[in-house]
A protein has these predicted regions:
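N-terminal intrinsically disordered, cationic/polar leader segments
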Residues: 1-147
Length: 147
C-alpha cells in the first residue's frame, strides 16, 4: 500500500513537472517568432550605417536572412521536444517499470534543449532554456526514485 501511494505521488509530481516543461517549450516557441525579421532589420540598419547610404542590396540582405534563419531555426527541436513530452506522459500513465525509459526521454529532452540554447537568438529564449534545464534536472532526480 505504501509503495503504491508513493508511486501515485511521484506520478502526480512528474505530471505537474512535465506540464511546466510544456509551458516553457511553448514560451520558447512564442519567443522564437520574429527573430529573423528582427535580424534583417538590424542587418539593414548596420549596412546603412557602415556604408553611409540608404541604398542596400535587398537580394544580399535576403540571402543573409536565409542563412541566419537556417542556422537559428529551432522548429525541429521544438517539434521533437513536444513529441518527447507526449511520450513522457504516456509512459508515466502506463503500468509497469518505466524508470529507465523515462530517464532516456529526459536525456533526449536535454539534448534538444541544449541545441536550442546554442541557437538562441534572444535573451528571453536563453532564460527559458535555463529554466527548462532546471526543470528537466528536477524530473531526472525524481525519476531516480522509481523502477
Amino acid at each position: 500500500e505504501m509503495r503504491k501511494a508513493e508511486g501515485e505521488n511521484i506520478k502526480q509530481d512528474l505530471l505537474v513537472r512535465i506540464e511546466r516543461v510544456q509551458n516553457l517549450v511553448d514560451k520558447i516557441a512564442e519567443n522564437s517568432k520574429g527573430i529573423v525579421e528582427e535580424y534583417v532589420s538590424k542587418l539593414e540598419k548596420r549596412v546603412k550605417e557602415i556604408l553611409k547610404t540608404d541604398v542596400v542590396d535587398e537580394n544580399r540582405i535576403a540571402q543573409e536572412a536565409v542563412i541566419y534563419a537556417d542556422k537559428t531555426s529551432i522548429e525541429e527541436e521544438l517539434t521533437r521536444l513536444n513529441s518527447h513530452i507526449v511520450q513522457f506522459k504516456e509512459l508515466v500513465n502506463s503500468d509497469g517499470p518505466v524508470g529507465k525509459k523515462l530517464d532516456f526521454m529526459i536525456q533526449e529532452m536535454n539534448r534538444e534543449t541544449n541545441t536550442i540554447g546554442s541557437k538562441a537568438g534572444s535573451g528571453e529564449i536563453t532564460k527559458a532554456v535555463i529554466d527548462l534545464k532546471v526543470e528537466l534536472e528536477d524530473i531526472r532526480e525524481q525519476i531516480q526514485n522509481i523502477e
